[in-house]
């Protein structure tokens, strides 16, 4: 990487104007070289001087001249040198010159003025005598040079003067920043003494951390120190060639002094707060800790300021020596004569800064209760520094890369996005050459182009569904033409949902269109509706009370989670579990089961996993307890989907079919809660038996101790009031009309008062809402056409001698299979309307509500695959700190399938028994 870019990427953004202006000095060097070139200088003198310098592009050309080129060699030499200076094209086609290394336009910074007389005696310096430096070093230089005294004096004098100005600028800024940071350091010492954490500064501390690595090693994640005569010498790394290619500026001959070492990638370092930091004592500790971290970052950046500028002076003098044939690097920099009148580059300055940083590490170790583990604390502070630099300079780096890419072939994020957009606009084709080209008036066709998208899996699925739907439309399946077309409609939608040839919610949007096109709606007289009437009817049906309840459930869940009500309550429940792994597992599953009842089983596993972070962080992916915990939460969230009428979309849809039988929230809880709890306990026992969790040692979970605010109490009151109104909805039906109207109350109260914003409303899972709408529309189409009645009568003849229990088992297995392989919600949308019609045709008045209720509960029991429901998808994506997944697909199959069967048994036994005694038949 070129040093000018190296300096840009590693400079503190707020200090940009105060670093060595490398680009300006580099431009000055080439300007001075141009001035020398314009004078009539003998070729031999140039060659003699060049022979004593480091080999480079100019030296190579001059060597050729000395070897005896023709008389025009001088002109060719001048011409080639001008090409280098004035940016003519190189053989690779790139422009030469330094247009790509313009000076950085830094932001104006408001600086605090500090009197230099107030600094420590070590920081006081005398003013720099430029004339003395010029005279001294010019004399030593001119003694070794031939007859070019006048030109050399002018170039040397100008360069050293500008170099001295840069040195004074850097030194002045450093002294002001050091005074500010050291004052903060003294205040920190006083605060630590007041808390009794450390003693005075002159107390001894760990000498092993005195010698700290440069900031560039902290950024790169390595703590190695390089032994070299020059501590600021840059070494090459293993990935030097890779980044050199990435930042290739197509220069014909890259100067070696432009090369610097590069850094290896590091992983991000993060810190998780634990619950012991919520009391007063821990708050003071947190404030002191943050103060130490911030001061550590500032002092390390101050140290990098020294390193980068020292490196810059060395690099720019090396370049001046090569281009202008001087010896400034050895005479000024390596001899350290140039730095004698500065404060920033004194060895005592760097030692004092290293000492302060070392003491901060020691203080941090004492504050964290690890005085004997200084190395670990040092690595932790380095991680904070790394994260700070990545965050602070990310925009700067992106902007610089974007700027560089205007003149070079660097592929930036914007370029990649543009490339992806262009690819997105184009279609890929299979091309087959024609035997003879087809000549048209304006074009000529030589190949037959067929889009590749016609041969993908999605295209094959869609093609198969279209063919089957066409066959069903062409072949008579029912005597009634409307039922015949409705059968094709059901097949088309079911296959689209099952195969996911298009997204599930898009199929939901397609349902009302197909309903109108297939002409399956009938009016009250049994006549087929026209397109206009059918469109109004089906679109009006989609926005129903069910959708309002679904939105209310999302609203309650968002408010409870966003204002930490659910999190605080869950933390107290987990704290009651103690330290036994099986008890902690049971409590975690109980928490997610309880949360699923009120904030849906979509959001509850995410919230529960965040609460379990302190338990999972110390464990890796091989821990049996961690596997059991992650899977147990997922299975419990699946089962929690049956616990309340708003716990899952399938329950909300099912309530629409249960309402005609007078089943409200009270009856729902009476059946669903015992069944769900028993299913959860069976899954808990399965986790204990299949995972060896007894050997894991756990720390006690600490609850979140906080006082609720008025807003939190308001949310709790509104939530409880809404649930109570839903429970007694049948008694107050004359006032509200339906549960959907009650659902408006929390939506208006939370969004109307500003507790939730429009952004929160937009983040609702609208795909689930649209999917539910499609299910309602399909149910309306099937019931209006009379297809369900016909199918129910046909099934009644075959199963009329079977009991309700046997029928529940038959349809229950079907629900389990569809829920496992397709979707819990889709299984409810397709099967429950059919089950209701079958139940209504049976002689037992309780058959229909029992079958509908049982199938509604079984819709949540499909847990055999990693894709079976949102909780399973969340669990399979959970990873440990190293990025390894806790669970595999095999783990889900080996535990999820038995858990599904256990839940199935619970529903057809306990659930069936309670529903038989609690539910009333149709009236």
Curated annotation (Swiss-Prot):
Annotated glycosylation sites: 162, 202, 274
Topological relation to the membrane, as annotated: Multi-pass membrane protein
Bias (Basic and acidic residues): 95-104
A Gene Ontology molecular function term of the record: phosphate transmembrane transporter activity
Keyword Membrane appears in the UniProt entry: yes
Cytoplasmic-side positions: 483-493, 559-583, 649-667, 729-735, 789-802, 871-898
Record topology, Extracellular segments: 1-461, 515-537, 605-627, 689-707, 757-767, 824-849, 920-923
Subcellular compartments: Membrane
BP-aspect Gene Ontology terms: phosphate ion transport; plasma membrane selenite transport; polyphosphate metabolic process; regulation of phosphate transmembrane transport; transmembrane transport
Region (Disordered) residue spans: 40-74, 86-107
UniProt key word Membrane: yes
Pfam families xref list: CitMHS (PF03600), SPX (PF03105)
Cross-link annotation Glycyl lysine isopeptide (Lys-Gly) (interchain with G-Cter in ubiquitin), location: 102
UniProtKB keywords: Glycoprotein, Isopeptide bond, Membrane, Phosphate transport, Transmembrane, Transmembrane helix, Transport, Ubl conjugation
InterPro entries per UniProt: Cit_transptr-like_dom, SPX_dom
Ranges of residues in domain SPX: 1-334
GO cellular component, one term: cell periphery
TM region positions: 462-482, 494-514, 538-558, 584-604, 628-648, 668-688, 708-728, 736-756, 768-788, 803-823, 850-870, 899-919
Additional observations: Present with 504 molecules/cell in log phase SD medium.
Physiological role: Involved in the uptake of inorganic phosphate.
Family: Belongs to the CitM (TC 2.A.11) transporter family.
Protein name: Inorganic phosphate transporter PHO87
Organismal lineage: Eukaryota, Fungi, Dikarya, Ascomycota, Saccharomycotina
């Amino acid at each position: 990487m070129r040093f000018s870019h190296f300096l840009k990427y590693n400079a503190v953004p707020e200090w940009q104007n105060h670093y060595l202006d490398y680009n300006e000095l580099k431009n000055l060097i080439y300007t001075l070289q141009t001035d020398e070139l314009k004078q009539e200088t003998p070729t031999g003198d140039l060659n003699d001087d060049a022979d004593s310098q480091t080999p480079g592009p100019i030296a190579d050309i001059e060597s050729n001249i000395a070897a005896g080129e023709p008389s025009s060699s001088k002109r060719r030499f001048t011409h080639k040198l001008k090409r280098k200076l004035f940016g003519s094209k190189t053989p690779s086609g790139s422009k030469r010159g330094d247009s790509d290394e313009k000076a950085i336009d830094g932001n104006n910074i408001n600086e605090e003025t500090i009197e230099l007389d107030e600094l420590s005696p070590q920081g006081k310096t005398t003013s720099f005598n430029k004339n003395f430096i010029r005279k001294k070093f010019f004399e030593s230089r001119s003694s070794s040079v031939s007859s070019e005294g006048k030109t050399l004096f002018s170039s040397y004098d100008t360069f050293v003067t500008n170099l001295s100005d840069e040195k004074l600028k850097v030194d002045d800024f450093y002294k002001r920043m050091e005074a500010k940071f050291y004052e903060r350091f003294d205040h920190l010492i006083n605060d630590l003494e007041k808390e009794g954490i450390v003693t005075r500064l002159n107390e001894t501390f760990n000498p092993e951390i005195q010698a700290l690595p440069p900031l560039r090693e902290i950024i790169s994640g390595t703590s190695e120190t390089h032994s070299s005569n020059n501590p600021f010498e840059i070494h090459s790394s293993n990935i030097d060639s890779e980044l050199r290619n990435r930042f290739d500026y197509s220069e014909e001959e890259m100067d070696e002094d432009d090369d610097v070492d590069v850094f290896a990638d590091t992983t991000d370092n993060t810190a998780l707060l634990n619950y012991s930091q919520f009391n007063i004592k821990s708050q003071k500790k947190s404030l002191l800790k943050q103060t130490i971290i911030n001061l550590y970052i500032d002092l390390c950046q101050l140290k990098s300021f020294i390193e980068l500028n020292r490196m810059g002076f060395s690099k720019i003098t090396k370049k001046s020596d090569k281009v202008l044939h001087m010896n400034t690097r050895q005479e000024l920099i390596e001899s350290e004569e140039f730095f004698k009148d500065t404060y920033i580059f004194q060895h005592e300055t760097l030692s004092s800064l290293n000492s302060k940083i070392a003491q901060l590490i020691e203080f941090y170790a004492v504050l964290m209760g690890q005085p004997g583990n200084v190395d670990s604390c040092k690595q932790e502070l380095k991680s904070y520094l790394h994260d700070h630099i990545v965050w602070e300079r990310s925009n700067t780096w992106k902007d610089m890369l974007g700027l560089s890419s205007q003149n070079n072939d660097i592929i930036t994020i914007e370029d990649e996005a543009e490339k992806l957009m262009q690819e997105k606009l184009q279609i890929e084709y299979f091309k087959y050459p024609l035997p003879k080209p087809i000549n048209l008036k304006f074009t000529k066709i030589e190949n037959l182009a067929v889009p590749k998208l016609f041969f993908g899996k999605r295209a094959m699925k869609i093609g198969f569904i279209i063919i089957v739907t066409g066959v069903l439309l062409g072949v008579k399946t029912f005597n009634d033409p409307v039922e015949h077309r409705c059968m094709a409609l059901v097949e088309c939608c079911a296959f689209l949902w099952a195969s996911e040839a298009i997204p599930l919610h898009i199929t939901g949007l397609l349902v009302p269109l197909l309903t109108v096109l297939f002409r399956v709606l009938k009016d009250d007289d049994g006549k087929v509706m026209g397109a206009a009437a059918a469109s109004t009817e089906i679109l009006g049906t989609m926005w129903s009370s069910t959708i309002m309840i679904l939105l209310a459930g999302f609203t309650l869940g968002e408010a409870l989670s966003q204002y930490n009500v659910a999190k605080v309550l869950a933390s107290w429940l987990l704290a009651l579990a103690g330290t036994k792994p099986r008890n902690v597992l049971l409590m975690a599953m109980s928490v997610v089961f309880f949360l699923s009842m009120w904030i849906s089983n979509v959001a509850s596993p995410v919230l529960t996993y965040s609460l379990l972070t302190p338990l999972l962080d110390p464990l890796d992916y091989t821990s049996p307890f961690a596997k059991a915990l992650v899977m147990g939460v997922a299975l419990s969230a699946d089962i929690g989907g049956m616990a309340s009428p708003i716990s899952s979309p399938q329950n909300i849809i099912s309530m629409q079919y249960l309402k005609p039988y007078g089943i409200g929230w009270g009856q729902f809880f009476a059946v669903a809660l015992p069944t769900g709890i028993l299913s959860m306990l069976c899954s808990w026992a399965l986790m204990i038996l299949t995972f060896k969790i007894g050997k894991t040692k756990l720390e006690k979970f600490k609850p979140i101790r906080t006082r609720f605010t008025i807003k939190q109490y308001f949310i709790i009151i509104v939530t409880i009031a809404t649930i109570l109104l839903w429970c007694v909805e049948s008694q107050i039906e004359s006032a509200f009309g339906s549960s959907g109207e009650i659902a408006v109350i929390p939506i208006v109260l939370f969004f109307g008062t500003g507790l939730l914003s429009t952004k929160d409303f937009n983040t609702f899972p609208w795909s689930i809402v649209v999917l539910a709408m499609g299910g309602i529309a399909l149910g309306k189409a099937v019931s209006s056409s009379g297809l369900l009645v016909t199918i129910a009568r046909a099934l009644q003849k075959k199963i009329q001698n079977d009991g309700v229990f046997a029928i529940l088992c038959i349809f229950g297995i079907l629900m389990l299979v569809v829920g496992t392989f397709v979707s819990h919600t889709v299984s409810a949308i397709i099967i429950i309307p059919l089950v209701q019609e079958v139940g209504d045709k049976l002689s037992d008045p309780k058959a229909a509500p029992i079958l509908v209720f049982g199938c509604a509960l079984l819709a949540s029991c499909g847990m055999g695959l990693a894709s079976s429901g949102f909780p399973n998808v969340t669990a399979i994506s959970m990873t440990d700190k190293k990025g390894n997944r806790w669970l595999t697909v095999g783990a889900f199959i080996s535990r999820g399938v038995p858990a599904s069967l256990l839940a199935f048994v619970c529903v057809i036994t306990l659930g069936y028994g309670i529903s038989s005694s609690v539910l009333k038949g149709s009236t």
